[in-house]
């Protein structure tokens, strides 16, 4: 009996560790090739459903979406409002200028680009649909600051290290038809480190 229980416990631990370390999860947002290699997984029906839900929130709060943040009236979503495309700038997504990265003097060459993620993996490794509702006036953007690999600007005794930061974005729960404010990791800088 004890051997059976031990075997079941070992199996559950293995399954949990495999699920926790999802190999599909990329380093940064917007790097996902899509589930099973598909580049687009958010169907037109889901997009329309999200648009209608965002429009309902905008009408409920009396906010058009083109002025103040649609979700700013709710304290839980206040953190998510700063990544709206109309207000976010590249420096908002940089991390190495702030603690604990101020001690890095050099930065490797960085490729900077903006993106509008439609899905991604949370910091807990859970797959989520990220809210993008352009018709309702709500779009979320992040700026990626990724190392240009192959650069040798750290000198002979260091190497480029990709730093990531956590951003809070509005997601849509399809099962419960509701919004959440969740954390995702995104690339934010590339300091040189000596090893």
Swiss-Prot record:
Other remarks on this protein: The sequence shown is that of coagulogen-1.
Single GO biological process annotation from the record: hemolymph coagulation
GO cellular component: extracellular region
Assembly information from the UniProt record: Coagulogen is cleaved after Arg-38 and Arg-66 by a clotting enzyme contained in the hemocyte and activated by a bacterial endotoxin (lipopolysaccharide). This cleavage releases the peptide C and leaves 2 chains of coagulin, A and B, linked by two disulfide bonds. Coagulin molecules interlink to form a gel.
Cysteines joined through disulfide linkages: 28-187, 30-115, 80-181, 85-141, 95-188, 108-160, 147-190, 154-192
Impact reported for residue 102 to I: In coagulogen-2
Matching InterPro entries: Coagulin, Cystine-knot_cytokine
Tissue: Hemolymph.
Family: Belongs to the coagulin family.
Top-level taxon of the source organism: Eukaryota
Cellular compartment(s): Secreted
Alphabetized UniProt keyword annotations: Disulfide bond, Hemolymph clotting, Secreted, Signal
Its biological purpose: Coagulogen is a gel-forming protein of hemolymph; it hinders the spread of invaders by immobilizing them.
Name of the protein: Coagulogen
Origin organism lineage: Eukaryota, Metazoa, Ecdysozoa, Arthropoda, Chelicerata
Major location category of this protein: secreted
Span of the signal peptide: 1-20
């Amino acid at each position: 009996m004890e051997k059976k229980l031990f075997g079941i416990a070992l199996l559950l631990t293995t399954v949990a560790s495999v699920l926790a370390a999802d190999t599909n999860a990329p380093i940064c947002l917007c790097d996902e090739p899509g589930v099973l290699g598909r580049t687009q997984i958010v169907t037109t029906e889901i997009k329309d459903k999200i648009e209608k839900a965002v429009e309902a929130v905008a009408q409920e709060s009396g906010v058009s979406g083109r002025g103040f943040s649609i979700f700013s009236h709710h304290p839980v979503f206040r953190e998510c409002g700063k990544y709206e495309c109309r207000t976010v700038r590249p420096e908002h997504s940089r991390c190495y200028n702030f603690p604990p990265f101020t001690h890095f003097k050099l930065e490797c060459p960085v490729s900077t680009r903006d993106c509008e993620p439609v899905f991604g993996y949370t910091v807990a490794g859970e797959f989520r649909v990220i809210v993008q509702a352009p018709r309702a006036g709500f779009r979320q953007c992040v700026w990626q600051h990724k190392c240009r690999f192959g650069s040798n600007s750290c000198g002979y005794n260091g190497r480029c290290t990709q730093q990531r930061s956590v951003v809070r974005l509005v997601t849509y729960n399809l099962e419960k038809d509701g919004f959440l404010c969740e954390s995702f990791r995104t690339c934010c800088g590339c300091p040189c480190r000596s090893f």
